[in-house]
Amino acid sequence: MNVEELPLLRQSERAAFKRCAWAWYMEYVRRIRPKVELGKEAADFGSLFHIALAEYYIPGLERGPHPADTWDKLSSDVVAAVKTTDYTNDETVAKWEDFHDLGLDLAEAYVELYRGDPHWLVLDAERRFDVIIPDVRYKPMVSEKGKRGYRPIVRVVGTFDLCVRDLNDNQVKMVDHKTAKDIITYHLTLDEQASTYIAVGTTALRHQGLIEPTERIVGMEYNFVRRGRIDDRPTDEDGQRLNKDGSVSKKQGSPNFLRYFVPRTSKERQRQVVRISEEARVMDDVRTGRMPLLKTPQRDCYFCKFFDLCELDESGGDTEYFISTTMQSIDPYADHREGAISSKKLHDA
């Protein structure tokens, strides 16, 4: 099989497949999505904040436009758009007007807290990658000249948020921006996104000449931004929030910002490559009908974009008519097609 004929695979797609193969099939094989998605404002908030940070962390030690300025422009455009759309919804308009102000406050506080991260030498931001993963069922082939070759199974594509050289220890690290309603870290040691990006990232960065052939990415720095109001109460020398009378408040609240580093060893990176290869094989078996297409019913199904379609499918209804009237065709790999312009940067490189 030629490289161009290999199936593409995104990290988010891996998670989607293991969450529910049927929903994965709808989005990544049928390539459909609802024409109108309710409740996706939080995800859009995160996407815009990512762009604001991508414009800020430009290669080198200098920094780009203030994230608040980029956020103001992008979110103002969204507010104007939701006010004029054919699907005008007062609740959506109000939410984005609130998000506009919230994002400005968070961007200002972010820069005030981290001061531009002078210890981060930015190697690249929002860099797309395309890495071939070998089929681990087959042993490497060795040519007469001693070169090792592999039988490919899938092309893993994606986008790194940020890659930096930490001048405090001269180590190369990935940085992943996370906007969320709550900051949760207990699962991150097993997070596959870190493992995947680091596993393929070292190879990608070496090929791009951004790191030396002997260097590797040592881990992922999760850069959390909690989507909540800034607590502007005064603090004591220990950083605890104070009441108006100067006493320490019993309600300290949750931090808006947190950095959490997860290291990855060479064995962990190698194991992730094996896992990607194994999952790609199972996906192909489902895609081609060699394995049954299964669903994973659970209480979170209500929040799935395909919930209504799934209910109709379970009841034996006319799903094809429903798809033709409520769904739109998409390309989940659009960002990674040849010549594509990145949707995650204002100015594509």
Walk through the language-model features, giving the residues of each.
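Metal-dependent nuclease catalytic regions and adjoining charged, substrate-binding loops involved
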Residues: 8, 186-187, 202-349
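Hydrophobic/aromatic-lined pockets within catalytic cores
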Residues: 30, 54-61, 111, 115, ...
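Active-site-adjacent bridging/hinge elements
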Residues: 21-29, 163-176, 275-281
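Extracellular structured ligand-interaction cores
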Residues: 48, 157-159, 217
